[in-house]
Amino acid sequence: MKASEMKKGSIVEYSNGTYQIRDIQRSSPQGRGGNVRFRFVMYSVPGGSKLEASFDADEMLTAVELLRREASFSYKDGEAFVFLDEEDYTLYTLDAEAIGDNAGYISEGLSGCYVQLIDASPVALQLPQHVVLEVVDTPPELKGGTATKRPKPAKLITGIEVMVPEYITTGERILVNTTTGAFGGRAS
Protein backbone atom coordinates (compact mmCIF):
# COMPACT_ATOMS: atom_id res chain seq x y z
CA MET A 1 0.00 0.00 0.00
CA LYS A 2 1.36 3.45 -0.89
CA ALA A 3 2.30 5.86 1.90
CA SER A 4 -0.22 8.36 0.48
CA GLU A 5 -3.05 5.81 1.05
CA MET A 6 -2.29 5.23 4.73
CA LYS A 7 -4.69 6.59 7.37
CA LYS A 8 -4.47 7.22 11.09
CA GLY A 9 -4.88 3.94 12.93
CA SER A 10 -3.39 1.83 10.12
CA ILE A 11 -1.02 -0.94 11.21
CA VAL A 12 2.14 -1.39 9.11
CA GLU A 13 5.31 -3.46 9.12
CA TYR A 14 8.38 -1.25 9.10
CA SER A 15 12.00 -1.78 10.10
CA ASN A 16 11.44 -5.34 11.42
CA GLY A 17 8.54 -4.27 13.65
CA THR A 18 4.80 -3.70 13.66
CA TYR A 19 3.60 -0.12 14.14
CA GLN A 20 0.33 1.76 14.40
CA ILE A 21 0.19 5.13 12.63
CA ARG A 22 -1.07 7.73 15.11
CA ASP A 23 -0.37 10.97 13.22
CA ILE A 24 0.25 11.89 9.59
CA GLN A 25 1.71 15.16 8.35
CA ARG A 26 1.80 15.92 4.63
CA SER A 27 4.49 18.22 3.29
CA SER A 28 4.15 19.72 -0.16
CA PRO A 29 7.18 20.53 -2.28
CA GLN A 30 8.32 24.14 -2.43
CA GLY A 31 9.64 24.08 -5.98
CA ARG A 32 8.66 22.45 -9.23
CA GLY A 33 8.86 18.71 -9.53
CA GLY A 34 9.34 18.02 -5.85
CA ASN A 35 7.80 14.95 -4.31
CA VAL A 36 5.07 15.11 -1.70
CA ARG A 37 6.34 13.55 1.54
CA PHE A 38 4.42 12.06 4.44
CA ARG A 39 5.74 12.11 7.99
CA PHE A 40 4.25 9.40 10.18
CA VAL A 41 4.30 9.27 13.96
CA MET A 42 4.07 5.57 14.73
CA TYR A 43 3.98 3.50 17.90
CA SER A 44 5.16 -0.09 18.13
CA VAL A 45 2.45 -2.71 18.54
CA PRO A 46 2.50 -4.04 21.19
CA GLY A 47 4.85 -1.99 23.35
CA GLY A 48 4.07 1.59 22.43
CA SER A 49 7.58 2.91 21.72
CA LYS A 50 7.45 5.96 19.45
CA LEU A 51 9.00 6.14 16.00
CA GLU A 52 8.88 8.97 13.47
CA ALA A 53 9.58 8.29 9.81
CA SER A 54 9.16 10.11 6.48
CA PHE A 55 8.08 8.51 3.22
CA ASP A 56 7.58 9.58 -0.39
CA ALA A 57 3.95 9.46 -1.54
CA ASP A 58 4.61 6.46 -3.83
CA GLU A 59 6.73 4.52 -1.33
CA MET A 60 5.21 1.13 -0.56
CA LEU A 61 4.47 -0.02 2.99
CA THR A 62 3.18 -3.41 4.09
CA ALA A 63 -0.17 -3.13 5.84
CA VAL A 64 -0.79 -5.72 8.55
CA GLU A 65 -4.13 -7.50 8.54
CA LEU A 66 -6.00 -7.03 11.77
CA LEU A 67 -8.82 -8.99 13.27
CA ARG A 68 -11.51 -6.57 14.44
CA ARG A 69 -13.93 -7.52 17.20
CA GLU A 70 -16.94 -5.40 18.13
CA ALA A 71 -16.81 -4.55 21.81
CA SER A 72 -18.24 -2.20 24.41
CA PHE A 73 -16.39 -0.40 27.19
CA SER A 74 -16.78 -2.35 30.41
CA TYR A 75 -14.62 -0.69 33.07
CA LYS A 76 -11.30 0.98 33.82
CA ASP A 77 -8.71 -1.05 35.74
CA GLY A 78 -6.11 1.43 36.97
CA GLU A 79 -4.65 2.92 33.78
CA ALA A 80 -6.01 0.11 31.59
CA PHE A 81 -9.32 0.09 29.74
CA VAL A 82 -11.29 -3.17 29.64
CA PHE A 83 -13.67 -3.91 26.74
CA LEU A 84 -16.21 -6.74 26.48
CA ASP A 85 -16.59 -8.61 23.18
CA GLU A 86 -20.21 -8.30 21.98
CA GLU A 87 -20.33 -11.89 20.62
CA ASP A 88 -18.39 -14.23 22.89
CA TYR A 89 -17.99 -12.03 26.01
CA THR A 90 -14.18 -12.11 25.95
CA LEU A 91 -12.54 -9.30 27.93
CA TYR A 92 -9.88 -7.28 26.11
CA THR A 93 -7.53 -5.04 28.11
CA LEU A 94 -5.81 -2.09 26.43
CA ASP A 95 -3.35 0.12 28.29
CA ALA A 96 -3.50 3.92 28.25
CA GLU A 97 -0.70 4.11 25.65
CA ALA A 98 -2.65 1.92 23.21
CA ILE A 99 -5.76 4.08 23.70
CA GLY A 100 -3.83 7.36 23.37
CA ASP A 101 -5.91 10.53 22.88
CA ASN A 102 -9.05 8.43 22.41
CA ALA A 103 -9.34 8.08 26.20
CA GLY A 104 -11.27 11.37 26.31
CA TYR A 105 -14.07 9.85 24.25
CA ILE A 106 -14.55 6.69 26.32
CA SER A 107 -17.38 6.84 28.84
CA GLU A 108 -19.43 4.31 30.76
CA GLY A 109 -21.51 2.06 28.50
CA LEU A 110 -19.81 3.10 25.24
CA SER A 111 -20.61 0.56 22.53
CA GLY A 112 -19.84 0.30 18.83
CA CYS A 113 -16.07 0.17 19.36
CA TYR A 114 -13.78 -2.25 17.57
CA VAL A 115 -10.84 -3.83 19.37
CA GLN A 116 -8.09 -4.60 16.87
CA LEU A 117 -6.20 -7.85 17.41
CA ILE A 118 -2.90 -9.20 16.11
CA ASP A 119 -2.33 -12.88 16.92
CA ALA A 120 -5.29 -12.83 19.37
CA SER A 121 -3.83 -10.04 21.52
CA PRO A 122 -5.48 -6.60 21.60
CA VAL A 123 -3.29 -3.84 20.16
CA ALA A 124 -5.55 -0.91 19.28
CA LEU A 125 -9.04 0.54 19.51
CA GLN A 126 -11.27 2.02 16.82
CA LEU A 127 -14.01 4.29 18.18
CA PRO A 128 -17.37 4.99 16.53
CA GLN A 129 -17.52 8.19 14.42
CA HIS A 130 -19.58 10.01 17.09
CA VAL A 131 -19.95 9.44 20.83
CA VAL A 132 -22.51 10.86 23.26
CA LEU A 133 -20.98 12.71 26.22
CA GLU A 134 -22.48 14.81 29.00
CA VAL A 135 -21.52 18.47 29.50
CA VAL A 136 -20.44 18.92 33.14
CA ASP A 137 -19.38 22.56 33.01
CA THR A 138 -19.96 25.41 30.58
CA PRO A 139 -20.56 29.15 31.01
CA PRO A 140 -24.22 30.26 30.93
CA GLU A 141 -25.74 31.55 27.70
CA LEU A 142 -25.28 35.27 27.17
CA LYS A 143 -28.38 37.29 26.34
CA GLY A 144 -28.52 37.68 22.56
CA GLY A 145 -25.87 34.96 22.16
CA THR A 146 -27.83 33.04 19.55
CA ALA A 147 -27.55 35.92 17.09
CA THR A 148 -23.74 35.92 17.05
CA LYS A 149 -23.01 32.16 16.87
CA ARG A 150 -20.07 32.50 19.25
CA PRO A 151 -18.77 29.14 20.44
CA LYS A 152 -17.92 28.63 24.10
CA PRO A 153 -15.84 25.96 25.87
CA ALA A 154 -17.61 23.03 27.52
CA LYS A 155 -15.97 20.50 29.83
CA LEU A 156 -17.30 16.98 29.29
CA ILE A 157 -17.74 14.10 31.72
CA THR A 158 -14.51 12.44 30.52
CA GLY A 159 -12.45 15.58 31.18
CA ILE A 160 -11.98 16.79 27.61
CA GLU A 161 -13.05 20.25 26.45
CA VAL A 162 -14.87 21.02 23.20
CA MET A 163 -16.24 24.22 21.74
CA VAL A 164 -20.05 24.27 21.69
CA PRO A 165 -22.73 26.76 20.58
CA GLU A 166 -24.05 29.30 23.12
CA TYR A 167 -27.36 27.45 23.61
CA ILE A 168 -25.73 24.31 25.12
CA THR A 169 -26.07 24.17 28.92
CA THR A 170 -24.53 22.13 31.74
CA GLY A 171 -26.12 18.68 32.03
CA GLU A 172 -26.95 18.30 28.32
CA ARG A 173 -25.78 15.31 26.32
CA ILE A 174 -24.01 16.14 23.06
CA LEU A 175 -22.53 14.29 20.09
CA VAL A 176 -18.76 14.64 19.68
CA ASN A 177 -16.89 13.64 16.52
CA THR A 178 -14.08 11.28 17.58
CA THR A 179 -11.94 12.10 14.55
CA THR A 180 -11.96 15.90 14.82
CA GLY A 181 -13.01 16.40 18.44
CA ALA A 182 -15.69 18.83 17.26
CA PHE A 183 -19.25 19.33 18.51
CA GLY A 184 -21.67 17.31 16.37
CA GLY A 185 -25.06 18.35 17.73
CA ARG A 186 -27.39 17.57 20.60
CA ALA A 187 -27.85 13.91 21.45
CA SER A 188 -31.42 12.64 21.18
Curated annotation (Swiss-Prot):
Give one Pfam family, short name only.
EFP_N
InterPro entries in alphabetical order: Elong-fact-P_C, NA-bd_OB-fold, Rib_uL2_dom2, Transl_elong_fac_P/YeiP, Transl_elong_KOW-like, Transl_elong_p-like_YeiP, Transl_elong_P/YeiP_cen, Transl_elong_P/YeiP_CS
UniProt cross-references to CDD domains, sorted A to Z: S1_EF-P_repeat_2 (cd05794)
Where would one find the signal peptide in this protein? none
Record-level GO BP terms: peptide biosynthetic process
Q: Which residues form a coiled coil?
A: none
Give one GO term, molecular function aspect: translation elongation factor activity
Q: For this UniProt entry, what's an example GO CC term?
A: cytoplasm
Q: Which domain of life is it from?
A: Bacteria
Q: Which family does it belong to?
A: Belongs to the elongation factor P family.
Name of this chain's protein? Elongation factor P-like protein
